[in-house]
């Protein structure tokens, strides 16, 4: 609680076996960026009620499988295509506004796209080259 309550950025990446609220709604301050990323829901049912914007990486991914921090919210109809602000790609492409003021409370639900993995892998490879670290492997 001392790490999360009133924080500017709240990130969770647990691997719980069953849903359990780790993020409590009353801990979220106005203007926070919240990224619950674990396999099970770690937020309370009313958590999405205080969000000014809910952003996802890819809406169709949010509908697949039994896992994800907002699974219960999607299955219950609380989070829908109409209630989310949009997808992160639309924000990055300038087609949709991102944060518009310091008081906006934003939740980003990152389900995990392979393009994210590829981009992160590329960034890691470039950094390793720049620092001249790592071992090159021959894949032929």
Spans of model-derived segments:
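Adenosine-phosphate binding glycine-rich loop
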Residues: 45-140
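Rossmann-like adenosine-cofactor binding region
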Residues: 2-78
């Amino acid at each position: 609680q001392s790490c999360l309550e009133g924080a500017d950025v709240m990130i969770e990446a647990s691997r719980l076996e069953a849903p359990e609220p780790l993020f409590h709604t009353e801990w979220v301050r106005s203007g926070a960026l919240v990224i619950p990323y674990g396999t099970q829901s770690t937020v309370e049912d009313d958590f999405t009620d205080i969000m000014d914007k809910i952003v996802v990486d890819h809406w169709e991914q949010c509908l697949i499988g039994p896992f994800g921090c907002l699974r219960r919210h999607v299955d219950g109809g609380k989070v829908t295509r109409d209630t989310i602000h949009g997808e992160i790609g639309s924000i990055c492409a300038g087609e949709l506004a991102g944060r518009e003021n310091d008081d906006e409370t934003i939740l980003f639900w990152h389900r995990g796209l392979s393009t994210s993995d590829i981009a992160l892998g590329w960034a890691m490879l470039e950094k390793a080259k720049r620092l001249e670290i790592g071992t090159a492997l021959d894949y032929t």
